[in-house]
């Protein structure tokens, strides 16, 4: 049976079930496993011998938390990661992830100009900005961030976490509008298409047409939960935290 592509509503429901009394996971446990999956997928696609410098672009929410975890693991996998985190969260568990990166001397940038400078020096980008809960319009500074990543996307490969930033979780890639400025004007921003996608738990409906290399990560879904929602998750091999899905042609 082919793997199931799930809706935003079902993705949220599965998260709730995983963190319920019967699922027994905590949010930071799931984030740790998700971030490890992303780091391993990037390592399989872009080994550190040729892609040592990784720009990890993080949003303010749980997607950014996955990126922070991945940055820590990438450091231990012999990469040189740099984190861009313009809007650090006030949540304790996310602040601890930042501190863990700082303890490894992983640079954490907040300024968009510094981000653009370091982006140009990167060998690969890990896109952990927006997840399946993102709702337009696009707010500062992420309008500049997405434009910058789009601008280098033909030269520097992108690995996106769960869903490429700015894509509709239902309909896939679409133009994004920024929020209105002081004069009532707004700008259309084109989204980028990554070379590699790491879906978490199960792929989302909006990536059905994705044609790049596609990994599934998040090796934490109990068999009964997978059967209940007919996810048809393929088996993971050995100690791997990711499994490659068939490419669309």
UniProtKB/Swiss-Prot annotation:
- Per the record, the domain of life is Eukaryota
Recorded GO MF terms: metal ion binding; NAD(P)HX epimerase activity; nucleotide binding
What remark does the entry make about the cofactor? Binds 1 potassium ion per subunit.
Which cofactor does this sequence's record say it needs? K(+)
Binding of (6S)-NADPHX occurs at 62-66, 131-137, 162
Catalyses: (6R)-NADHX = (6S)-NADHX; (6R)-NADPHX = (6S)-NADPHX
- GO CC list: mitochondrion
Q: Which HAMAP family match?
A: NADHX_epimerase (MF_01966)
UniProt similarity note: Belongs to the NnrE/AIBP family.
UniProt-recorded name of the protein: NAD(P)H-hydrate epimerase
Q: Which organism is it from?
A: Cryptococcus neoformans var. neoformans serotype D (strain JEC21 / ATCC MYA-565)
């Amino acid at each position: 049976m082919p793997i199931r592509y799930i809706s935003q509503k079902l993705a949220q429901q599965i998260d709730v079930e995983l963190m319920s009394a019967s699922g027994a996971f905590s949010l930071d446990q799931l984030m740790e496993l998700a971030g490890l999956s992303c780091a391993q997928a990037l390592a399989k696609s872009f080994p550190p011998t040729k892609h040592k410098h990784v720009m990890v672009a993080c949003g303010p929410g749980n997607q950014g938390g996955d990126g922070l975890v991945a940055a820590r693991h990438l450091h231990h996998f012999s990469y040189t990661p740099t984190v861009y985190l313009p809007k650090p969260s006030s949540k304790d568990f996310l602040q601890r992830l930042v501190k863990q990166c700082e303890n490894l001397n992983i640079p954490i940038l907040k300024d968009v100009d510094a981000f653009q400078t370091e982006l140009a020096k990167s060998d690969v980008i890990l896109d952990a900005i927006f997840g399946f809960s993102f709702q337009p319009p696009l707010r500062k500074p992420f309008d500049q961030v997405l434009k910058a990543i789009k601008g280098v996307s033909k030269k520097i490969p992108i690995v996106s976490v769960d869903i490429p930033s700015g894509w509709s979780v239902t309909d896939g890639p679409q133009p994004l509008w920024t929020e209105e400025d002081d004069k009532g004007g707004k700008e259309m921003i084109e989204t980028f298409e990554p070379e590699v996608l790491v879906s978490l738990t199960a792929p989302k409906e909006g990536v059905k047409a994705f044609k790049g290399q596609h990994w599934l990560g998040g090796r934490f879904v109990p068999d009964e939960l997978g059967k209940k929602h007919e996810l048809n998750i393929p088996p993971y091999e050995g100690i791997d935290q990711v499994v490659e899905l068939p490419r669309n042609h």
